[in-house]
Design a protein with these regions (language model features):
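Hydrophobic-ligand binding "helix-grip"
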Residues: 29-32, 42, 58-108, 114, ...
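Hydrophobic beta-strand positions in extracellular immunoglobulin-like domains
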Residues: 10, 113-115
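A conserved amphipathic terminal alpha-helix motif
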Residues: 108, 115-160
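Short aromatic-glycine motifs in intrinsically disordered, low-complexity regions
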Residues: 48-56, 85
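Generic structural detector for well-ordered beta-strands
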Residues: 7-11, 53-55, 64, 99
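Hydrophobic ligand-binding cavity/cleft-lining segments
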Residues: 1-44, 160
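Short structured motifs
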Residues: 3-4, 38, 48-50, 61-62, ...
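Soluble or luminal CAZymes and related metallo-dependent hydrolases
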Residues: 57, 92, 133, 137
Length: 160
């Protein structure tokens, strides 16, 4: 089982950071990536029970939100991964989760994801390749969110 762990600190309060990152369609709707909500969550559109499809780099991930505790934590699991032709990939996702914790006036975000590729002999190698790519993608997403949120915080505090 391969685990990704990416960390960043965003100069904004936890609720604001949580709201931005748990807004799946906006947070995951970036250049080279498309996300749409297939099913709304139980108590919150983006909350527990929500199902999203994320298309990126020739793959489509169907993910379900399995835990939702604003503004501290949410979890998801990839239920299915297919290529652009609809062929299922051999990919087992244990879970992914994001934790949001106050860090002074900012928020620390920890993003974890655990998965395996059950292919004899090559699986361990493919896990590392995919894991490094995914970690880079997670970092980029968090950096974009950081830039947007810190820009809002700065522009929101500017007096005329």
């Amino acid at each position: 089982m391969y685990e990704i762990h990416v960390v960043t600190t965003i100069a904004a309060p936890p609720q604001k950071v949580f709201d931005a990152i748990s807004d799946h369609e906006h947070f995951l709707g970036r250049p080279g990536m498309i996300c749409h909500l297939v099913k709304e969550g139980v108590q919150n559109k983006n909350g527990r029970g929500a199902v999203r499809e994320v298309a990126t780099q020739g793959r489509i991930f169907t993910e379900e939100i399995t835990a939702f505790d604003p503004p501290r934590h949410f979890e998801y699991v990839v239920r299915r991964m297919v290529d652009r032709h609809g062929k299922s990939a051999r990919f087992l996702h244990d879970r992914g989760w994001l934790d949001f914790a106050p860090s002074g006036p900012a928020t620390r975000v920890d993003w974890h994801s655990r998965f395996e590729i059950p292919i004899p002999i090559l699986g361990w190698f493919l896990e590392r390749v995919l894991g490094k790519r995914a970690a880079t993608g997670f970092r980029q997403l968090l950096e974009q969110a950081k830039s947007e949120l810190e820009g809002q915080t700065t522009s929101g505090n500017t007096e005329p």
